Amino acid sequence: MTPAPGGAPAIRLRPAHPGDLPACVGVWHAGLTEYGVRVGRPAMPLTSGPLLRLLGHLLATDPDGFWVAVADAPGAAGAVTTHDPAGAEGPIIAFVSALRREHVWFLSMLFVQPGHQERGLGRRLLAQVLTGSDDATHATCTDSAQPISNALYSRFGMVPRLPVLELVGRPERPVTGLPDGIRAVPFDLLRAGPTDGAGPRRLAAALELLDRGALGYAHPQDHAYLGAQGRQGYLYEGGDGSVVGYGYASEVGRLGPIAVEDSILMGPVMGHLLGSVRPAGAFSAWVPGSASAAVAALLAAGLRLEDFPALVCWDRPFADFERYVPITLAVL
C-alpha cells in the first residue's frame, strides 16, 4: 500500500476478482467520458454488457495480468464503488489488464478514475503487470490524442509505430467480392458434429496456421470467445482446398478479426464480410493503416473515418498488419 499525503486515501494494488468487473466498467466509462470532454467528443452512453463480457474474458484467460487499485477509505472523491458485500475495503479507482499470447505480452486496458490521474498510479499498475515478462515482445494500442499515456508506454519500450483507423457506417455502394476460385465456408458448417471430429480439427488447424503467419502467434482462446459472442466466422479456401484466409462479422456490426495469406485478398474478404450480414446498426472496424486494401474497400463501400486514429505500439515487430485486422484495440 502506498501512503498518500495530506489525508488523501492510500492506494493499494491487488489482483482483480470477478466481482470487481462492474466497478472497472465504471472507471472505464468515467475515464473515457472525461477524456471525451477534453477533445470535444460527445458523452458516451453507459452500455456495460459487451464490456463486462470482454473484461470477463480477459480475467478468465489472464488472471495474473488483471489488477485493480483500491482506495483505503470508502467514498473517495469521484471513485466508483466496487462489488464488496462485506464493506471491507474502499472503492476501485483504477485497473489494468494485460494478456500473454505465446511470446507476445499485450496491454489491453489501463484506466484511472478522473481525480486520481497524473499521480503515478498508471505507472504503478503497468509496472505490476509487466513483472516477469522480460522475455516477451511488448505491445499495446493507444489513442493518438493521449500524450501522457503515449509517453508512459514509450518509456517501457512500447513506441507508437502504426495508425489504426476506425471506419463506421452502412454500405452505400457495392464493393468487389471474392475472386473466382475462392469460396467462403462458414465456421458453423465446419463445427457441426463431434467437437473432436474432422471439421473442428481442420478449422482449429487453419486458424492456427493463419494466425501464426499474419499475427505472429496462435490464440484459440480468443477465437472461442468470438464464437461465444455470436460473431460469424468464415474460412476462405482456394479451388484446390487450400486455406487462404478467415474473417468475422456480426449482427451488431463488428468486422474482424481478419487474417489472409496474401494481402491482395484483404479487400475482397472485407467486401464479402460486408455482404454476409445485415447489422442492426452500422458496421464498424478498426483497420491498421498498412492494411490498405481493407481500408480502400470500406471507404469505397461508403463507410467513413471516425475521430482520431489509434496507434499500435511495440518494442519489437511481431505481426504483419498488412494481412491482419484485429478483434478490438483491447485484444488483437
Question: What are the residue ranges of the model-derived segments?
Answer:
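Conserved acetyl-CoA-binding loop-helix of GNAT-fold acetyltransferases
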Residues: 109-112, 117-131, 150-155, 263-276
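Conserved GNAT acetyl-CoA-binding A-motif
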Residues: 104-109, 132-146, 278-289, 308
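Conserved beta-strand in the GNAT
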Residues: 66-68, 78-99, 106-111, 240-256
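Conserved active-site tyrosine of GNAT-family acetyltransferases
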Residues: 149-154, 158, 296-300
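Amide-forming acyltransferase catalytic core, primarily the GNAT-like/NAT-type
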Residues: 155-253
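A short, well-structured alpha-helix characteristic of acyl/acetyltransferase catalytic modules
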Residues: 2-8, 18-37, 175, 191-210, ...
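Conserved catalytic-core motifs of GNAT/GCN5-like acyltransferases
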Residues: 139-142, 159-173, 305-316
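Active-site rim helix/loop that mediates acceptor-substrate recognition in acyltransferases
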Residues: 2-4, 21, 26-88, 212-232
